[in-house]
Amino acid sequence: MAVLGSPLLPLRLFLCFGLLFFSASCTDHPDQCMIFNKVTSIHNSRIQVNPKVYESNTVYTVSVPVNNTISSVVMKAVDMHHSVIGFWQKADMNCTSSALYHVKSPHEHVLEAKWLSPASTNINTVELQVFVVDFHKEATASVLKLEKSGTSPALITKLITTKSNTVTTTKPTVITTHTTHKNSANRVFRSPVRDAIQILLAFLTSKLLF
């Protein structure tokens, strides 16, 4: 029996390691556009958006002042429930909840990004979060609020918090967010498949071990 059981040992170990690797690989990945070494909230009244009131299914132009110390600008739009909404057009990198635009030239003074608001008419307030990132991966964050009423957008200083409620840190900071309905649906779809594979691996492992 020992002779017959010994060839099965590598297979048992392989299945055990496979189960652990699969479980680790199924965890959610952070938003790659939102990993910074430092985040500071500021009041930047020079950031402009046009049009100045919120309407559904409308293209907005966000103008962000930049200089030769800025490497990129990360844009993010959320509704009053902090769910990511809309679509950032022609971004250099689209991430889980945000979009990244590279500063193409050191002589560039204004970076423009276009955002398409969702078709839903149930949204009254939108926050456009702007992260201006330098070459040290340190970001300054500003929030521009668009309202459906006839009021002008109010650029406000708002603390962009992480899981540990830390704004400024020496370690890489990952900005967390709620996902869209599409991302939620993908996770709901993947969850039964992931559970089924884990159960199958556990079943095969138990059969080989016992």
Curated annotation (Swiss-Prot):
Residues 27-189 are extracellular. Its main location: membrane. GO terms for cellular component: apical plasma membrane; external side of plasma membrane. It is a single-pass type I membrane protein. InterPro entries: PLET1, Reeler_dom. The chain crosses the membrane at residues 190-209. The keyword Glycoprotein applies. The keyword Membrane applies. GO terms for biological process: cell differentiation; negative regulation of cell-matrix adhesion; positive regulation of cell migration; wound healing, spreading of epidermal cells. Keywords: Cell membrane, Differentiation, Glycoprotein, Membrane, Signal, Transmembrane, Transmembrane helix. Residues 210 are cytoplasmic. It is found in: Membrane; Apical cell membrane. Residues 1-26 form the signal peptide. Modulates leading keratinocyte migration and cellular adhesion to matrix proteins during a wound-healing response and promotes wound repair. May play a role during trichilemmal differentiation of the hair follicle. This is Placenta-expressed transcript 1 protein. The gene is PLET1.
